[in-house]
């Protein structure tokens, strides 16, 4: 008879010290550094607890009360709780919480509503779109006739008239709105008018702005879109995962079939539990306060970056993120990204609209405020962060291979700032 006592009692530190050391190292990195990657956030301890629960043991193919396995009573309640909370949060009629990621949510929508070879229109990566919106290397770019639209070369804003003209020409079956680097509000009503003119589905990917939509800080796409997807981390501050929403129950049936059995097998019930926790947190008044602070912090950070000699794409931000154009300083995104990381500040190199640099080089960086706001940073702290970033960039102008003296000083200041805002305790 095998001895199961150790299997059920040993901690991770005891059972796998090598992996435990790696996780401890990552926790230290998060604790002592400033996270400005716009697509990242910090979940609550309650979300972590749900994700680490015994629900990870349970297979639950199907949907609540329509499963292919027995023993699903508790997970049925869990999934229904996540669905009901999401419906309330976004004021919609249909929700599927099973997608493992935003990319899989997007893929399931396309599987539900399109046939291979259909024409789709999505924003190009260079203008701020996402890989899954028809970029050439992605499945959506290979399976469909993917037409990409750009922002205006003059204003760098979404040019709705140009998109309408393009749609009238190519007659897409689906128009995709949303992206990964759009700092301004999106006019979903105008997008729906364009879609209706050509008989297309309007599909909105609100992964980046879901928290803003949930709190009314950004207009909701749900009154206008046929279908909406989102991730559940980013500004929603939940576990990494995806979700599909709609007010069309007939489309909802197609989407459910596309998610399972079409695109995925068993749902990750421990992650869905984490989603339920996060949606419950987002329904509380303090989450609205948090999102308002995220946006205020982004505006404050953008103002400092401009004051210190950078350009902000579109001149500012209405959301949680901004694109910093480094060309006025003669810098490249990859060098800035690396220098900032050496100084304890994590962001990502990012192309700017009509960038002439390669994707692994870029002319810009993307900055976001959700994660640092989650740990308690306010406007004063983000103004400080803006100056620290600018110090590193100016040091890089002086010494293009890296400025050890400036980076060491900024790193020390970052460490001191982070001590005031500890994470899990």
Curated annotation (Swiss-Prot):
Annotated site location: Plays an important role in substrate specificity: 233
Coiled coil: none
GO cellular component, one term: cytosol
UniProt pathway annotation: One-carbon metabolism; tetrahydrofolate interconversion; Amino-acid biosynthesis; glycine biosynthesis; glycine from L-serine: step 1/1
PTM annotation (N6-(pyridoxal phosphate)lysine): residues: 234
Keywords: Amino-acid biosynthesis, Cytoplasm, One-carbon metabolism, Pyridoxal phosphate, Transferase
Positions that bind (6S)-5,6,7,8-tetrahydrofolate: 125, 129-131
GO biological process entries: glycine biosynthetic process from serine; tetrahydrofolate interconversion
Location relative to the cell: Cytoplasm
Organism superkingdom: Bacteria
Family matches, as InterPro entries: PyrdxlP-dep_Trfase, PyrdxlP-dep_Trfase_major, PyrdxlP-dep_Trfase_small, Ser_HO-MeTrfase, Ser_HO-MeTrfase-like, Ser_HO-MeTrfase_PLP_BS, SHMT-like_dom
Documented EC number(s): 2.1.2.1
Record bears the keyword Transport: no
Xref: NCBIfam families: PRK00011.1
Function: Catalyzes the reversible interconversion of serine and glycine with tetrahydrofolate (THF) serving as the one-carbon carrier. This reaction serves as the major source of one-carbon groups required for the biosynthesis of purines, thymidylate, methionine, and other important biomolecules. Also exhibits THF-independent aldolase activity toward beta-hydroxyamino acids, producing glycine and aldehydes, via a retro-aldol mechanism.
Protein family membership: Belongs to the SHMT family.
PANTHER family to which the protein is assigned, alphabetical: SERINE HYDROXYMETHYLTRANSFERASE, SERINE HYDROXYMETHYLTRANSFERASE 1
Assembly information from the UniProt record: Homodimer.
UniProt-recorded name of the protein: Serine hydroxymethyltransferase
Species whose genome carries this gene: Marinomonas sp. (strain MWYL1)
Lineage of the species this protein comes from: Bacteria, Pseudomonadati, Pseudomonadota, Gammaproteobacteria, Oceanospirillales
